[in-house]
Amino acid sequence: MENSICITGIKRRPGDRGGRSDTDPGRTDRTCDHLQITAYQSSADNIRKDYQRKFRNLSVVSTGKKEMTTGYVRGEVTVYLTLTFILLVSLVLALTESASIQMAKNYRRADMNRAVECVFAEYQKELLEHYDVFAIEAGYESGTYSEQNLLDRLSYYGADMENDIKRIRLFTDQNGELFMDQAGKYMKHKYGISWADKYLGSTSIWKNQERQADEITREEKAQTDHLEELLNGQEMELPGEENPLEHVAGLKQAPILNLVLPKETQVSEKQIVSEDMPENRENQTGHGTFEDVESEGGTLDSVLLGGYIQEHFADFLDEPKGGSLDYEVEYILAGRQSDRENLEAVANKLVLLRFVPNYLYLQTNSTRQAEARAAAGTLCTLLAVPAVTEAAAQGILLAWAYGESVMDVRTLLNGKKTAVVKDDASWQLSLSGLMKLGTEEDTGDGADVEGGMDYKDYVRMLLFLEDKGKLTVRTMGVIEKDMQTIYSQPSFRIDYCVGRMEVDTVCKLRRGISYRFQTYYGYQ
């Protein structure tokens, strides 16, 4: 079946400027073109031809002033083409809608990122200025910790959505892992890894020296017990006069500071309440894990932490800062409640560290061993038991090494250097001088040895050997006290300090669409 449609097009004749006919001024003379298009309805006989466009020859008929073009063009619009067109339009509209929704999501994310960055820009400025670490004080100087404070600040900065803190890490969580990480990064940024390399080579020596100190301490106890057994077996006692063993045993019972401090040195008597320190109280805790962003600690972290502590806190030889304690580094090492107790604990540790090389030197020096045997023979003259004499000689060597260690620590606390490994020239204490140690006749201040180690070097060793978790928590305790007393922040608490946070957000888009996403931020 065919239906013909005639479309007539009229065009102006060339050369006719006014658009009026020469014969009829009131009528416009135009050329009429006739284009007849046949709409073809397919039937069963010519289905194959339904997919073809058929054109017939066009003929131009000239009729005087008019030119008429006649002919036929057959056009077809199939169901397939219609569906294709609909699908194409649907795809375009779907892509447009998807892009629009994605753009709305991006705007919400941008709002949230901006708000989170603004909140983390509100770090505690005194903490950064004096201790070079970043943290938000979640109490906001109110004295009360609340995560709602952080959510309110997010809303204030434009993230007015349904927000919930999915995970949060405070400074005191995980034994101060976050604080230690920031302290280490500060040291690497300021000094570089090369600064730590010069100490990393000594760490194995320090560990070995600590192990040897434990072994020699056990050996000393075993030697003392063995001598007592021998004496008990003979039902005798060593004489009390001119007895190095008894004299040194008495020195060990006396306060160590009486032996090692320079004459007329005034010891700080400042104290703190141990129960108020983060190490001993119940602290605020965060929630959630940050295993995806946490770094593994190691030897380097211990060295960096020790360097950070020595740079930011005062020790016995430094000028006091005016905080709750004067000997801050000693507190970090010992954790006692008073300056005196902390200094005593550190001095005892130093004596033990120096005891190892001193005893090893005596074991290799035949001259001094001979002196010890002679003194033991004098003590045991009445006993006439060789085993007792030999045990007493070993006991005298141990006592002599202890006395030399006291002299070494006295040297260190005087701000001088002591030899790492002793020789005849650097050995300070004679056997006769051992009997004067701790008496009125004891006037030696210790000899300064060029190229040796000073007090700060040994403190660095002690910091490395101490447990990192304890050091970190005590360090944060000193910071808290200093912030409260020195830097006029009475409500500051270290367990209110936030360093990492992830926020879960739900927002409403148009037409009831909900969008959930997470935003993480942490100080690096």
Question: Where on the chain are the PLM-derived regions?
Answer:
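Generic structural motif recognizing short loop/turn segments at the entrances and edges of beta-strands
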Residues: M1-C6, D33, R114, D164-R167, ...
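N-terminal leader/signal peptides at the extreme start of proteins
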Residues: M1-R17, T23-P25, D29-R74
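Alpha-helical assembly-interface signal, strongest on the long, hydrophobic N-terminal helix that forms
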Residues: C6, I47, N57-L58, T63-Y145
